[in-house]
Amino acid sequence: MPPNLTGYWRFVSQDNMDNYLRALDLNVALRKLVXLLKFDKEIVHEGNHMTIRTLXTXRNYXI
């Protein structure tokens, strides 16, 4: 059984994100766009099932 990570996980910082994206060879425009995104996570455990929601300004994802 996985550890219980239930909660709301707020994005804090992107230290060295630009250097990381540059190493991945992303162009300048895409790097600037990624630097503006702030993703938060909401994790819910229900028995053996885990739901992870990624919350962003433009779009939300559920896994």
UniProtKB/Swiss-Prot annotation:
Function: Binds vitamin A2 in the eye lens and thus functions as a UV filter. Intracellular transport of retinol.
Keyword Transport on entry: yes
Similarity comment: family membership: Belongs to the calycin superfamily. Fatty-acid binding protein (FABP) family.
Keywords: Retinol-binding, Transport, Vitamin A
Transmembrane segments: none
GO molecular function, one term: retinol binding
Species in which this protein is naturally found: Gonatodes vittatus
Domain comment as written in the entry: Forms a beta-barrel structure that accommodates hydrophobic ligands in its interior.
Protein name (record): Iota-crystallin
InterPro entries: Calycin (IPR012674), ILBP (IPR031259)
Lineage top rank: taxon: Eukaryota
